[in-house]
Design a protein with these regions (language model features):
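Acidic catalytic loop of the alpha/beta-hydrolase fold
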Residues: 236-237, 257-261, 288-289
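Short substrate-entry loop that stabilizes the transition state in hydrolases
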Residues: 48, 59-71, 76-113, 259-263
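Alpha/beta-hydrolase active-site loop
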Residues: 119-145, 166, 175-199, 214, ...
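Cap/lid segment of the alpha/beta-hydrolase catalytic domain
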Residues: 81, 85-88, 92, 105-128, ...
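Short beta-strand/loop motif that positions the catalytic acidic residue
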Residues: 246, 252-254
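Domain-level recognition of soluble alpha/beta enzyme cores
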Residues: 15-76, 96, 279
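Gly/Ala-rich beta-loop-alpha elbow adjacent to hydrolase catalytic centers
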Residues: 156-160, 164
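Short alpha-helix in the alpha/beta-hydrolase fold that links the catalytic acid
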Residues: 248, 262-272, 295
Length: 343
């Protein structure tokens, strides 16, 4: 017993001394041209520093050298109007445990540019951009030597959850916008653009054009992705048939009081049809934005809508659970049996 306790203490101390590094990750955008900004997080053998990137307090050391060995890769897709650092605590947590994590900023659908909302460049382009990020890392000699191409996963929140489902093989049916907006016409987040199209008498034509564009930039699905961790997804566009082609294990997390993407029409509507679903977590009393990293005082002051939770919801504690769920899920879904793992 004493020997086992000693080994546990050594392992715990070793883990405490490990840190995370990160550096910019520019990726060519195959949808719009130009470059997508992003970051890559990775494990270090020394403790992390705390640095500021805009309003984000990131617990990772910029530019530090990644540890040796082949590691699993996870790509993170942010929500509508989000940021490449919107889930930095999850990226750091996974990096602490031996993962390489890439976070990208989706063009035309981020905090400083929403001009692509509702267009094919966003609704079809998002999964293509995730695939391009994987391509870029595997084509880079430095990162290729650090990544195990057989252990790749994806994380997505909100519109990023929609993105992750598509990368995992789901096929949306855009006419479901009409069905949903007939039931919930006052949902400004989802239905405002459709209402404008309806006034022009063109909503059916526009949705049909979106459907026709599903493979405009290639197949949105990526067979290299072996696991998808999905948070509060925009999933009302998927029916049973569209979900039947998902090839990867899934974990689904949603907020009980989400009034942006109501669970009844999104997370809970798809859960019964996810044949590869391995786990589901309901966050009691929380709203949609609880999945974003806990906010710094600066971010809370400038963006209270995405930083404010009900009094009974502690976002820091919620994220301890989210990060633990993600780690457990990816460890089970991506680890190759019998292979010696880093960390």
């Amino acid at each position: 017993m004493a020997a086992l306790l000693c080994l546990w203490l050594v392992a715990a101390l070793a883990q405490a001394d490990e840190g995370a590094g990160f550096q910019p990750l520019p990726v060519d955008d195959p949808v719009n041209g130009g470059t997508m900004p992003g970051f890559v997080f990775y494990p270090l053998v020394e403790p992390s520093r705390i640095v500021w990137r805009g309003p984000y307090e990131v617990h990772a050391t910029p530019g530090a050298r990644v540890t040796d060995g082949s590691k699993p890769l996870v790509v993170v897709s942010h929500g509508h109007g989000g940021s490449a650092l919107g889930h930095h605590d999850l990226a750091v947590s996974l990096a602490h445990h031996g993962f390489i994590v890439a976070t990208i900023e989706h063009p035309l659908d981020n905090f400083h540019d929403l001009s692509g909302t509702g267009t094919a460049k966003v609704l079809v382009g998002r999964p293509i951009q995730v695939k391009a990020t994987i391509d870029a890392l595997l084509a880079d000699a430095h990162w290729n030597a650090k990544i195990d191409p057989g252990r790749i996963g994806v994380v997505g929140f909100s519109a990023g959850g929609y993105t992750a489902l598509m990368v995992a093989g789901a096929v949306p049916r855009f006419s479901r916008f009409l069905d949903y907006c007939e039931l919930q016409p006052h949902d400004a987040e989802i239905c405002s653009a459709l209402a404008k199209a309806k006034l022009r008498g063109s909503e059916g034509t526009e949705l049909a054009a979106l459907q026709a564009d599903l493979r405009k930039w290639g197949n949105p699905a990526d067979s290299r992705v072996k696991a998808a961790f999905v948070m509060a997804p925009l999933s009302l566009l998927f029916d049973k048939a569209g979900l039947s082609s998902i090839h990867a294990p899934l974990f689904l997390s949603y907020a009980e009081n989400d009034d942006v993407l109501v669970p009844k029409y999104n997370a809970l509507s798809v859960a019964p049809f996810l044949k590869t679903l391995t786990g589901i977590n309901r966050i009691p009393k929380a709203g949609h934005y609880v999945f974003l990293s806990p906010c710094s005082p600066q971010l809370a002051a400038s963006a209270p809508a995405i930083c404010t939770d009900p009094p009974e919801v502690d976002r820091v504690s919620v994220h301890e659970r989210i990060n633990a769920d993600a780690l457990t899920f990816f460890n089970q879904a991506l680890r190759i049996p019998g292979q010696v793992q880093d960390h």
